[in-house]
Amino acid sequence: MSNISTDLQDVEKIIVLDYGSQYNQLISRRIREIGVFSELKSHKISAAEVREVNPVGIILSGGPNSVYEDGSFDIDPEIFELGIPILGICYGMQLLTHKLGGKVVPAGDAGNREYGQSTLTHTPSALFESTPDEQTVLMSHGDAVTEIPADFVRTGTSADCLYAAIENPDKHIYGIQFHPEVRHSVYGNDILRNFALNICKAKGDWSMDNFIDMQIKKIRETVGDKRVLLGLSGGVDSSVVGVLLQKAIGDQLICIFVDHGLLRKGEADQVMDMLGGKFGLNIVKADAAKRFLDKLAGVSDPEQKRKIIGNEFVYVFDDEASKLKDVKFLAQGTLYTDVIESGTDTAQTIKSHHNVGGLPEDMQFELIEPLNTLYKDEVRALGTELGMPDHIVWRQPFPGPGLAIRVMGEITEEKLETVRESDAILREEIAKAGLDRDIWQYFTVNTGVRSVGVMGDGRTYDYTIAIRAITSIDGMTADFAKIPWEVLQKISVRIVNEVDHVNRIVYDITSKPPATVEWE
């Protein structure tokens, strides 16, 4: 399966060299928010390769290394001679100092180790234009610059950092010891904007509107008169890919939508009505609910459930694809976060590139990934720009195995229905309360636990439904959402009154870690 990726070679860009910082993606995203395309590159990139990429600016990221240690991440020194503006952040500043003849020592030796917010005091500089002379920044460094290279000047200090900002304005090389990409640095975005627009002279015209035009042109050139196959799940990513491809190549796109009977309430109809109706996507629907449920009968182990569903999805998709003729391309909703490891090689940023949907590698298609340069928030913005409604663009994350992993133990139609109906009530009430954009993810779980209850004059022995709602920034860590009690009460009352075989509601107040977001 060969791969045809998004080509943004001609787009004005700032590259971020990856030195292992946990904030690498954040730097790239902040630059994009300013209106300049940005992507991560390996710190091993050569000066010749940088010339080929032709960026308007280069950012050296932070990282966990010390520049004076053997094996620390390095840089091709010829990059400093290219005449391209450079901004070194934290480790990036220490690295450029070290390579250009300055001195870096363990901060403990210099008595100026810094972690947390600090007050930066700066002198006039293009980098700090239109920001206060004193401002709050986030410091996070165990080493410190004690001597700066020749022809550099100091432009910033803090209480514990003699050289918090340095620069060689003639060569357009800048270094800052703090992290402007995080919100704790109050004027960080202004500093990055000054670098991108004033120092690098970028136009700041990167937008989803431009991206759509470029992608449509690229897709048409790549596909020609051939047909493209897309596995449509109804999720945000595959839906946006579908609408974008439809806009580019019309009926040359064929979508396969596998309804495995494990979707949320009304989801299958919504996919067909909205994407097939309003947007005119050519959708082949595979009604495979009985096939999946038969395979899952008697299975309680969550990993076994996942494996069965994954394998069966491949079989169903392959069955449907084999009926189609003259299909040359397979489209996928792969995002930039899925493929970052192709441009970087530090342990902190490697993320396994996944073959979305688990499709077999021996399928004879060329791969098209129109979103593989975009972050999730940009995909949502793209969907909005394409005219897609909020209820699709802002759809909740949904696991590939669907409701199967929100039913503890063996899956039955009865259990699935309790989750499907209770989840619909939860989503409706969260939206009514205006909390749907504040909560990262929310859903219900059939715990598989039955308990005694009283309804009317009779005794019941029915299922316990758990509500899971979390707040998060990146999904790596999470806290339970502090939903107002009156909203929870309304949700609880509605579920026990409107959903059969349920007599008890509990609220999951566990953070991640120790718990995961999903129960299985």
Curated annotation (Swiss-Prot):
Q: Where is the Glutamine amidotransferase type-1 domain?
A: 13-205
Pfam families for the chain = GATase, GMP_synt_C, NAD_synthase
Q: Provide the GMPS ATP-PPase domain boundaries.
A: 206-395
Residues of the active site: C90 (nucleophile), H179, E181
Top-rank taxon of the source lineage equals: Bacteria
Task: Supply the EC number(s).
Answer: 6.3.5.2
Q: How does it assemble?
A: Homodimer.
Q: What is this protein called?
A: GMP synthase [glutamine-hydrolyzing]
Tell me the organism's taxonomic lineage: Bacteria, Bacillati, Bacillota, Bacilli, Lactobacillales
